[in-house]
């Protein structure tokens, strides 16, 4: 066990802006128009552009590694997406470490955007 069981991670509030959504989509080479073109996203039934799965995964990993420190190694991640995350949302991450696993949830005002488990060792 790399950390004592039963540790609640500090909350992290991420202000989601159009720049966050567009730049993370471009950084992950996701050129789907729903991540950078509001009109295209609306035509497809969304209220606005939205965060892609690779960005969400990266933010989950960042949340855990910011807490665990530079010696931590992520050994696995399993996530499930829920409600979309749009510009203007605050994506609030919470987590709970038990053994070598961290349960993570990311919520917006409209509901749970992501939930999952990250396996960590040091």
Q: Could you tell me what each predicted segment is?
A:
Residues 1-49:
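Catalytic strand-loop segment that frames the active site of acyl-thioester-processing enzymes
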Residues 1-12, 85-122:
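HotDog/MaoC-like acyl-thioester-processing domains
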Residues 5, 15, 25-27, 40-41, ...:
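A sequence-composition feature that detects small, non-aromatic residues
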Residues 43-51, 55-99:
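Hydrophobic beta-strand-centered segment that forms part of the acyl-chain substrate-binding groove
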């Amino acid at each position: 066990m790399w950390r004592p069981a039963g540790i609640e991670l500090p909350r992290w509030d991420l202000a989601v802006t159009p720049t966050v959504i567009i730049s993370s989509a471009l950084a992950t080479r996701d050129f789907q128009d729903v991540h950078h073109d509001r009109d295209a996203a609306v035509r497809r039934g969304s209220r606005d552009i939205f965060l892609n799965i690779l960005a969400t995964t990266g933010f989950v990993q960042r949340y855990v590694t910011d807490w665990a420190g530079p010696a931590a190694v992520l050994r696995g991640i399993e996530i499930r997406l829920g409600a979309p995350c749009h510009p203007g949302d605050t994506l609030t991450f919470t987590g709970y470490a038990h053994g070598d696993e961290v349960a993570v949830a990311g919520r917006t005002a409209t509901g749970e955007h992501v939930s999952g488990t990250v396996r960590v060792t040091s």
